[in-house]
């Protein structure tokens, strides 16, 4: 059995428990982060950790089938952090937040994070930039606009 890091980002990381089985282990396993239990009964070979801090070293541990595995990793550094709610977003699930959320995304520099706190945000098309993270806090939901005329048509794409 082996524990591997698939991807480390600024505020999350994805791991795989390589156990010779597809998708699920034979028995659920315990996942710890810096010695504290995160999942008591993880039942997927690939799992994620969230709400991490940028540029921080962590140790993830797995206790599976009598074996203990651990792996130290560092989250990516973050160059900029912006709370998108400071752009005037309304988290009621009905107000169109497309322009305001797009402004937050467009002004975020490379390596930065646009943070969306818990709430329901209605929006149409958003255009992301490379090397920018849109981080949705637990309870944050993006709702797509139901009106197709609010979405651009991109000719030739």
Which positions does each model-derived feature cover?
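Extracellular/periplasmic carbohydrate-active domains that bind, remodel
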Residues: 1-157
């Amino acid at each position: 059995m082996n524990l591997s890091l698939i991807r480390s980002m600024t505020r999350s990381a994805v791991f795989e428990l390589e156990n010779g089985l597809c998708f699920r282990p034979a028995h659920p396993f315990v996942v710890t982060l810096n010695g504290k239990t995160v999942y008591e009964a993880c039942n997927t070979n690939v799992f994620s950790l969230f709400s991490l801090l940028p540029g921080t070293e962590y140790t993830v541990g797995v206790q599976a089938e009598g074996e203990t595995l651990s792996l130290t990793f560092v989250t990516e550094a973050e160059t900029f952090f912006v709370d998108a709610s400071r752009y005037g977003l309304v988290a009621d699930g009905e107000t169109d937040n497309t322009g305001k959320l797009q402004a937050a995304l467009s002004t975020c520099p490379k390596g930065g994070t646009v943070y969306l706190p818990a709430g329901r945000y209605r929006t149409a098309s958003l255009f992301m930039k490379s090397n920018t993270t849109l981080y949705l806090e637990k309870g944050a939901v993006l709702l797509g606009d139901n009106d197709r005329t609010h979405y651009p048509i991109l000719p030739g794409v």
